[in-house]
C-alpha cells in the first residue's frame, strides 16, 4: 500500500511554495539571525537530549544511550559550536587577484544562500544525520524541508515537534513518510537536494533531481575496507576494529566493512577483535550498550548472510552471550575467509559482522579493493608512515584514517563525503556551508575601465592588448 495520498502531495507543495516565498522575502539572512538559528539547534539538542535517547531506544528496541549521547547529541552540540565560531569568517567575501590587463577593479566571491533545500535522512543515526545537514543549511541562510526515515518513527516525530518549537514551517519543515513520500519529495524543484542513504536509492534521487536541474549531494554507503600491513601488530588490531565495527551494532556508514590482513595473521586479528568486544560487552545479549538491529527485515538479512558464509565453509567466531530473546540482537561476529562471491563480500554489510581475509602483499590488497566500487572510507593499519602513504596513493576513497577507524568523521574541518558509488559532494564545517551556498563571482570596475579599448572598431590598441 502506498504511504502517500494526493492531500499529502498538495501539502508538501504548499510548504515548498511558502518556503520559496519566505526566501524571496529574505534572500540574505543576516549573520545575527543565522547565529540565532544555530543557537536554536544547539539548545534543542541539549534540551531534548533524554527524549532523543528515548526515541532512539524505542526505534531500535535497544540503542545504547551512551552511543546516542556520543554520536548524535555530543556530536551535534560540538558541530553547532564549531559553526557558530567560524560562521563570520565563512560569510566574508573572498577577494581574488585581478589580472593586469583587467585592472583597475575588485574581484571577489560572495557566498550566497541557495534558497529552499530538501534533506532526506536515513535511520542509522536518525538525529545527527538529519540535524547536521540542517545546521549547515541554516548557517548558509537557506530554508529547509526534511524527510526523515520511516524506520525510526519515534525519532522522526520527535524531530518534527522539536523543530516546530523554534522554527516556522516556512523556515524548517518536516515531512513524514516512507519511499513513496520520499519520491514525491524529490520531485519538488529545490535549490539543492541533500540525500543520505543507500547507493541504490541515491541513483533514484539523482535522476529525480536531474529533472529540475537541482544540484544534489549524495552521502551514500559502500564497503569500507581495512588494509593491514606486515609491520602492524596484529594482536592490537582488535582494540580499534571492535569499536569501529560494533558501535551501533555495525549500522554505521563508515564502519570497517571487511579486513585484509597479511598472510598468517587473520586469526590473530579475529581473536583480538572478539577478545576486545567480549570485554566491552561481557554479555552482549543483555548489555544495554550493545545495540539491536533496527528492523526484522534487516535482522533476517544479516542472519542469512552469516548462514550463507557458514554453508560455504567460512569459519564463524562469535562473542559469547546469553539468549537475546526477541531483542533483534546479533552476536558480535567475525567471519574468517568468506568466499569473494558471498553476499558478505559483495554487499555493504551494515551490521555486526566483520569478514577477515588474507592478502598476498599490499599490492594484492589494493588491487582487490580497487576492483570494487570506490568506498566511503578506507582504513590503513601500518606502523610505517611511508607504507601508509603508499596505500593512500594506491587507492581511492571518500575519506581515510591511518591506524584507527571512523575518527575522521569528527574532525569538523575535514570534508565528509564519498566518491564514485559512495557519493558526491561533502559537508561538515565549512564544506557544509559551501554545499548550501552559491559561490557568486563579482567583478567591480570603475565607470571608465580600460576594457573599452578592446571593443570594436578593432585597431592598434586592440592588437597590442591581445597580442600573444
Ligand atoms: P535508504 O536509502 O533505504 O533510505 C534513506 C532515505 O531515503 C529514507 O528517508 C527513505 O525513506 C528515503 N527513500 C527511500 N526510497 C526513496 C525514493 N525512491 N525516493 C526518495 N527517497 C527515498 O537508506 P537507509 O537504509 O536508511 O540507510 C542505509 C544506507 O545509508 C547505507 O548504505 C549507509 O551506508 C548509508 N549511509 C550513508 C551515510 C553517509 O554519510 N554517507 C550515513 C548513513 C548511512
What are these regions (language model features)?
Residues 34, 80, 141, 172, ...:
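Residue-level signal for inorganic ion chemistry
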Residues 98-236, 263, 359:
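Rossmann-like NAD(P) dinucleotide-binding subdomain of oxidoreductase/dehydrogenase enzymes
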Residues 2-3, 30, 227, 322-323, ...:
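Conserved C-terminal structural/oligomerization subdomain of aldehyde/semialdehyde dehydrogenase
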Residues 1-108:
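N-terminal Rossmann-like NAD(P)+-binding subdomain of aldehyde/semialdehyde dehydrogenases
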Amino acid at each position: 500500500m502506498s504511504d502517500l495520498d494526493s492531500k499529502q502531495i498538495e501539502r508538501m507543495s504548499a510548504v515548498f511554495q511558502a518556503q520559496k516565498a519566505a526566501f524571496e522575502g529574505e534572500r540574505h539572512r543576516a549573520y545575527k539571525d543565522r547565529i540565532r538559528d544555530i543557537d536554536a539547534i544547539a539548545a534543542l539538542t541539549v534540551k531534548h537530549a533524554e527524549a532523543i535517547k528515548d526515541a532512539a531506544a524505542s526505534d531500535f528496541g535497544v540503542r545504547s544511550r551512551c552511543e546516542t549521547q556520543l554520536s548524535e547529541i555530543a556530536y551535534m552540540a560540538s558541530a553547532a559550536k564549531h559553526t557558530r565560531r567560524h560562521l563570520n569568517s565563512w560569510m566574508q567575501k573572498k577577494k581574488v587577484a585581478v589580472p593586469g590587463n583587467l585592472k583597475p577593479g575588485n574581484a571577489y566571491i560572495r557566498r550566497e544562500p541557495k534558497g529552499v533545500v530538501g534533506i532526506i535522512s536515513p535511520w542509522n543515526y536518525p538525529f545527527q544525520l538529519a540535524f547536521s545537514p540542517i545546521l549547515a543549511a541554516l548557517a548558509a541562510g537557506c530554508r529547509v524541508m526534511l524527510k526523515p526515515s520511516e524506520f525510526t518513527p519515534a525519532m522522526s516525530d520527535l524531530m518534527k515537534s522539536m523543530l516546530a518549537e523554534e522554527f516556522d514551517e516556512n523556515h524548517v519543515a518536516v515531512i513524514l513518510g516512507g519511499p513513496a513520500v520520499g519520491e514525491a519529495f524529490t520531485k519538488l524543484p529545490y535549490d539543492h537536494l541533500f540525500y543520505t542513504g543507500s547507493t541504490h536509492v541515491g541513483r533514484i534521487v539523482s535522476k529525480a533531481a536531474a529533472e529540475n536541474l537541482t544540484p544534489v549531494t549524495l552521502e551514500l554507503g559502500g564497503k569500507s575496507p581495512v588494509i593491514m600491513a606486515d609491520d602492524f601488530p596484529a594482536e592490537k588490531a582488535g582494540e580499534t576494529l571492535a569499536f569501529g565495527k560494533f558501535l551501533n551494532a555495525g549500522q554505521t556508514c563508515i564502519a570497517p566493512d571487511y579486513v585484509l590482513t597479511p598472510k598468517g595473521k587473520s586469526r590473530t586479528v579475529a581473536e583480538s577483535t572478539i577478545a576486545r568486544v567480549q570485554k566491552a560487552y561481557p554479555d552482549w545479549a543483555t548489555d544495554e550498550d550493545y545495540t539491536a538491529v533496527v528492523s526484522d527485515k534487516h535482522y533476517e538479512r544479516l542472519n542469512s548472510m552469516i548462514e550463507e558464509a557458514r554453508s560455504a565453509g567460512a569459519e564463524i567466531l562469535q562473542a559469547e552471550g546469553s539468549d537475546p530473546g526477541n531483542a533483534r540482537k546479533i552476536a558480535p561476529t567475525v567471519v574468517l575467509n568468506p568466499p569473494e562471491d558471498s553476499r558478505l563480500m559483495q554487499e555493504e554489510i551494515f551490521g555486526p559482522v566483520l569478514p577477515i581475509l588474507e592478502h598476498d602483499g599490499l599490492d594484492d590488497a589494493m588491487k582487490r579493493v580497487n576492483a570494487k566500487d570506490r568506498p566511503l572510507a578506507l582504513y590503513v593499519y601500518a606502523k610505517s608512515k611511508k607504507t601508509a602513504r603508499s596505500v593512500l596513493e594506491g587507492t581511492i576513497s571518500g575519506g581515510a584514517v591511518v591506524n584507527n577507524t571512523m575518527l575522521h568523521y569528527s574532525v569538523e574541518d575535514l570534508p565528509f563525503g564519498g566518491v564514485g558509488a559512495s557519493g558526491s559532494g561533502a559537508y561538515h564545517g565549512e564544506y557544509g556551508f559551501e554545499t548550501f551556498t552559491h559561490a557568486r563571482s563579482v567583478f567591480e570596475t570603475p565607470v571608465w575601465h580600460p576594457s573599452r579599448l578592446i571593443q570594436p572598431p578593432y585597431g592598434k590598441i586592440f592588437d597590442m592588448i591581445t597580442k600573444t
